[in-house]
Amino acid sequence: MQRIILLLLIIFNLKSFSQTVKVVDFDTEIPLENVVIYNENKTIISHTNKEGKVNITEYLETAILSFNHIGYVEFEILKKDLKQVHYVVKLHKKSLQLAEVILSVSRGVEMKTRIAEQVSVVTASEINQLSPQTSADLLAVIPGIRVQKTQLGGGSPVIRGMEANRVLLVVDGVRMNNAIYRTGHLQNSITISPTVLERTEIIYGPSSVIYGSDALGGVINYFTKTPEINKEKKVNLTYLSRYSTANDEKTNHVDLELSLNKWASFTAISYADFGDLKMGKNRNHDFDDWGKVFQYSDNTNTFYNPVGVNNPNPNLQKNTGYNQLDLLQKFYIPLDKKSDITFNIQYSTSSDIPNFDNLAEVTSGKLRYAEAYYGPQNRFLASTNLHFNPDYDWLEKGSLIFAYQQIEESRIERRMSSLDRFYRYENVDVYSLNGDFSVALNKLKNRNLSYGFELTHNEVASKAFGKKIAVSGNQITGFTRDFVIQSRYPDGGSEYSSAALYTNYRQDLNSKSTLNTGIRFTSTFLKAKWIDNTFITLPDMDIDTENKAITATLGYIYKPVVQWQINALISSGFRSPNIDDIGKIRYKSGQVTVPNIYLKPEYAYNAELGIVRYFKNKTFQIDLNSYYTLLHNYIARGAFEINGQRTLVYDGVTAITQANINFNNAYIWGGTVGFSGKLIENLKTKGSLTYTKGKSYDKKLPLSSIPPIFGDVELNYTFQKFQTGINYRFNAAKKLADYNLEEGIDNIEQTPILVATGKYYGTPKWNTLNWNTHYLLSDKVSLSFKIDNIFDTHYKEFASSISAPGRNYIFSVLIKI
């Protein structure tokens, strides 16, 4: 009898010892990770794992447990009452605006209600719902951002009328912008797979106090997933598979998280294969042949054809497909209770990416290029991120990030019926060290000081050569000889470095207002050397420049009542010319860009006002952000002479010379109005409308990269495990008179031609209707189905060479084990 009683006691104790609660979303019943659970005096604190589970054995039966998660309403319950809800806690979403924590504005954690800057956040769950093919496609659905595409393997984000090297890209605290980030259009955002993103944050407008050079139009911060120490579950496996019909996309992704007692690991592999892209068939713009591909080149590395091939389906954009491989490896190691270190390795590579812009160019009815493609676009990053919380009087917490990046780019071209093939290769090594520190200056933590430094060093190697191919029939059998061609950047090597210090102060003046101010000093250094003067001789073939800049910001947040928030901001930014600005030699559309060794920095002075109005207990909001930016000494392409000459022979073609030049002043102004929130139970909506205007004061010409009015509206319905939504996207027309025709950045030649006048029309207006649905088969398996561009509309995004996808059916499955 004693043994039976003892056995029953053991069973009872085991049952008590293994008390586990599962926390899920009230609407979707999706398990919630990182929910914080604590008792009344917070002597015991726990967190849910990826399955939403947490062990609550150590809490007293009489304890009141509080369940807290960013984005959800706090929930309290007596531990002994959990049995009545079957140990399942369902949390209700609260207003997104109240919940948002911003990581990028001060390079640390800050509530959005204490930030004057306009900021957008996209979470991992939203990324899963959007299911974008690339990170560029992800940016295209964020309010206030347009994405230009020269080819399928690309995507150049435009923020507040600025793009390329006027927009700063950052991944895991490391700046991606390097010495050869160019003006015009930049495609590097695709080198980060959206499948590994934990969140993406966009800061709109000049942010040079925290981020330094290039942060004029805004900052795009990518945060990749990081492993955690998890006592509940040691292994987490995720698999994603997606198929899209418009370009025969096949994406497969797998990631594995291992959590041990003293360290954790996250490994991710993503592979995407994209076929040729089909454009829409319905031409509401009434230009019957605009964008159609009637002929294409079937030339390859080994196959020679002196003429183009007729395309049996002109709506299929031949020579657009490519594939891409992305790898991510992270190790997280807690060193002690006050410090931890994260090792981060990223690698992205691709196949050759066809340059559709060139391959589709037709001259006198014939294709201009037989071969035009980018070689594999390789990006490697290795970083070490040390976090520490010493809690000193002058340093409460901080981080040090040391990073190394290697970027490889190449361009291979051969004109139709020519035997001369041109090769240009660029290699960039980037070293950086960032230190970011913060401290609360009082016990209430309403006075905060942050400060830090940044050191970067870029080394650029550029080489170029030509080879004459040997042909037998239609086969390329080898090469007959080599010949000299002009390199894209200085062939003697070049370097670009920066050093900066900053400080930022934030104070809650009272319960209704917050003041923020900051200042940064940055110094940049550039060295470049040209050796070969076969084609071009500069006034100085060996240059050494240094530029200095002080930037500042002043922000004020005022909340007169609970329903209103007013943000005012004055800020400045700058961009120091890099190697691409000063030293690039490049041909396009009859013009060749040549070096200008006398180029100086450009500056931006910005004023903006933001207003937020909340409704229905902050479950719905309307917001307005307006701004005016003055560009001083701004850099743009213009007519330029080399040794008194306005022409130059480039790859055997005589072209008119131009260069990046400093002009006096220009302005950009505009704004975005948006709304988001709950209409009724289970039904949510959001939308935005963006207007941008830019013009030079001295030349009285429109600025490049200024998109027409654009916006979107969407409705989303959620019921338990089912979610569905519709999205309407629209874009106004941009007329010829609103284009800058001097620079050639906006690709006016990619717009339709009016038959009556023979002039370019500009970008026609367009709109698309899109539908998506998601269903949770279980807490481990979810299915998604989308139809983009339901009416199969033909259109091109502003300044794009490639037509947008036509009707696109997208199927995906997500499995978490």
Task: Cite the ranges covered by each PLM segment.
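Outer-membrane beta-barrel signature, preferentially recognizing the C-terminal barrel domain
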Residues: T245, Y369-D391, P490-S494, M541-K559, ...
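Surface-exposed extracellular loop regions of Gram-negative outer-membrane beta-barrel proteins
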Residues: T349-S351, Q406-S410, S523-T534, D544, ...
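N-terminal periplasmic accessory domains that precede
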Residues: V85-K90, S135-L138, G155-V158, L169-V170, ...
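Face-selective signature of the C-terminal outer-membrane beta-barrel domain
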Residues: P334-S348, Q377-N533, A549, I557-P560, ...
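Short, acidic, small-residue-rich periplasmic hinge/interaction motif at the N-terminus
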Residues: V36-E40, N68-Y72, Q84-N128, A164
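Transmembrane beta-barrel wall of Gram-negative outer-membrane proteins
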Residues: N247-D273, N284-S351, N378, K443, ...
